[in-house]
Amino acid sequence: MGSKSSKSSGFENVPSLGLSHTNQPRVSLIREARPSLYGRYNCKCCWFQNKNLVECSDHYLCLKCISSMLRRGQNCEICGKPIPTHIAVTTAPTAPPEP
């Protein structure tokens, strides 16, 4: 309500994502990577994270790397396709169901 600006969120330089358009399909967030025949799934950008991964065409990216790439542009630096910006977060129960 005043002329003072609020705290910086750190996303001032992120390009507009057009979140009002809902025609882009939602990509699911993978909370914990599944083991595979060839080892575990990792973020293809940093090769470290194996939790909170998002599938981008044929590989996975962690949320930190996606945020970093979105600051520089809207296309993935690995495959060149648009970075998924609509993520469906599934809710997991925090406690076992009551008997």
UniProtKB/Swiss-Prot annotation:
Example of a GO cellular component annotation carried by this entry: host cell perinuclear region of cytoplasm
Topology versus the membrane: Lipid-anchor
Organism whose genome encodes this protein: Oliveros mammarenavirus (isolate Mouse/Argentina/RIID 3229/1990)
Subunit note: Interacts with protein NP; this interaction probably directs the encapsidated genome to budding sites. Interacts (via RING domain) with polymerase L; this interaction inhibits viral transcription and replication, Z partially blocks the product exit tunnel for the releasing nascent RNA product. Interacts with the glycoprotein complex; this interaction plays a role in virion budding. Interacts with host eIF4E; this interaction results in eIF4E reduced affinity for its substrate, the 5'-m7 G cap structure.
Zinc finger (RING-type) residue numbers: 43-79
Gene3D superfamilies associated with the record: 3.30.160.310
Residue positions bearing lipid (N-myristoyl glycine): 2
Subcellular location per the Swiss-Prot or TrEMBL entry: Virion; Host cytoplasm, Host perinuclear region; Host cell membrane
Processing after translation: Myristoylation is required for the role of RING finger protein Z in assembly and budding.
Free-text domain note: Late-budding domains (L domains) are short sequence motifs essential for viral particle budding. They recruit proteins of the host ESCRT machinery (Endosomal Sorting Complex Required for Transport) or ESCRT-associated proteins.
Stretches with biased composition (Polar residues): 1-11
GO MF term (any one): zinc ion binding
Family listed: Belongs to the arenaviridae Z protein family.
UniProt motif PTAP/PSAP motif: location: 93-96
Keyword vocabulary terms for this entry: Host cell membrane, Host cytoplasm, Host membrane, Host-virus interaction, Lipoprotein, Membrane, Metal-binding, Myristate, Viral budding, Viral budding via the host ESCRT complexes, Viral release from host cell, Virion, Zinc, Zinc-finger
InterPro entries reported for this sequence: RING_finger_Z_arenaviridae, Z_RING-type_Znf_sf, Z_RING_Znf
Entry annotated with the keyword Zinc: yes
Protein function: Plays a crucial role in virion assembly and budding. Expressed late in the virus life cycle, it acts as an inhibitor of viral transcription and RNA synthesis by interacting with the viral polymerase L. Presumably recruits the NP encapsidated genome to cellular membranes at budding sites via direct interaction with NP. Plays critical roles in the final steps of viral release by interacting with host TSG101, a member of the vacuolar protein-sorting pathway and using other cellular host proteins involved in vesicle formation pathway.
Domain of life: Viruses
Protein name, entry field: RING finger protein Z
Gene designation per UniProt: Z
Taxonomic lineage of the native organism: Viruses, Riboviria, Orthornavirae, Negarnaviricota, Polyploviricotina
